[in-house]
């Protein structure tokens, strides 16, 4: 999708709005971490003889001269082979190379950004991998972005009529339907399918979800609350539906062939994140925490 030209200008209470958004992202992080740890406790099927995993939080600060930092929360468990739930709030100036790509940054390179990012890779091949992020960005303009997408790793589960796919799409459609003045589900669904695509393989990364960016209030600053409420509901719907999908599948036995297929599919995940993902590029270009940025990569991968 082509980047729009966003109206410039910030409301008088922009600092309050920044603090409100940051507090939400951090609250959602804590809620999801508690939920995922509960899943670790609930497992009774394969690998249940292992100890349940727990998140290890790690705070970080940007390098000297750069502003802000964040918290990495990583877990390697018996349900989640690797999951990261991260928040960050950073500020500074975009590099000359990067400022042309960001609305409102060409004349004034200063920026502020806060958000949450999550990627989960499960032990059981029947449990789909998942990604979710939402963020607020401020330059001389302001906007929200984010989305969520599901990646089943077994080909027989990578269909639009699979029960997991149907439930995931329904949850995100509900988030959009609750906010018709600011959210466009058909557009965001199509945007996700266009974005999470590997051109060199001519195949999608997963079964889709939603993707949105540059969601802004323009000169109608009262719309900020409506935009923020939608962003919150994306997080709430994700936090409700994905644990349900895990519960449906995490006790299902799997074969060595299933595990092999999972590892090969993860290779596609690596290819997308390193070649095309805007979030990865944004983090590396703005002096983000490299360990946190690359934590999205799965722990074990295979290229046949």
Curated annotation (Swiss-Prot):
SUPFAM superfamilies: Coproporphyrinogen III oxidase. The keyword Cytoplasm applies. Pathway: Porphyrin-containing compound metabolism; protoporphyrin-IX biosynthesis; protoporphyrinogen-IX from coproporphyrinogen-III (O2 route): step 1/1. The record marks 200 as: Important for dimerization. Keywords: Cytoplasm, Heme biosynthesis, Metal-binding, Oxidoreductase, Porphyrin biosynthesis. InterPro entries: Coprogen_oxidase_aer, Coprogen_oxidase_aer_sf, Coprogen_oxidase_CS. One of its GO terms (cellular component) is cytoplasm. GO terms for molecular function: coproporphyrinogen oxidase activity; metal ion binding; protein homodimerization activity. A divalent metal cation binds at residues 121, 131, 169, 200. It comes from the Bacteria. This is Oxygen-dependent coproporphyrinogen-III oxidase. It comes from Allorhizobium ampelinum (strain ATCC BAA-846 / DSM 112012 / S4).
């Amino acid at each position: 999708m082509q980047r729009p030209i966003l109206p410039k200008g910030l409301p008088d209470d922009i600092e309050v709005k920044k603090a409100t958004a940051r507090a939400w992202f951090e609250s959602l992080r804590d809620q999801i971490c508690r939920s995922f740890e509960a899943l670790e406790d609930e497992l009774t099927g394969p690998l249940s003889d292992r100890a349940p995993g727990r998140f290890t939080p790690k705070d970080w600060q940007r390098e000297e001269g750069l502003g802000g930092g964040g918290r990495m929360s990583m877990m390697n468990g018996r349900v989640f082979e690797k999951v990261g739930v991260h928040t960050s709030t950073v500020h500074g100036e975009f590099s000359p190379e990067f400022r042309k790509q960001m609305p409102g940054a060409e004349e004034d390179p200063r920026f502020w950004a806060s958000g949450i990012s999550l990627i989960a890779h499960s032990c059981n091949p029947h449990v789909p991998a998942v990604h979710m992020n939402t963020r607020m960005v401020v330059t001389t303009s302001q906007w929200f972005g984010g989305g969520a997408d599901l990646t089943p790793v077994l080909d027989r589960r990578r269909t639009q009529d699979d029960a997991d796919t149907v439930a995931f799409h329904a949850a995100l459609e509900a988030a959009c339907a609750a906010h018709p003045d600011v959210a466009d589900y058909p557009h965001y669904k199509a945007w996700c399918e266009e974005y999470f695509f590997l051109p060199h393989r001519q195949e999608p990364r997963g079964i889709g979800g939603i993707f949105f960016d540059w969601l802004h209030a323009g000169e109608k600053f009262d719309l900020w609350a409506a935009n923020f409420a939608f962003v919150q509901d994306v997080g709430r719907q994700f936090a409700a539906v994905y644990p349900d999908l895990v519960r449906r599948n995490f006790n299902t036995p799997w074969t060595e062939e299933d595990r092999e297929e999972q590892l090969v599919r993860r290779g596609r995940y690596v290819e997308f994140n390193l070649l095309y993902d805007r979030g990865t590029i944004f983090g590396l270009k703005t002096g983000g925490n490299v360990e946190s940025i690359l934590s999205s990569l799965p722990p074990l991968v295979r290229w046949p």
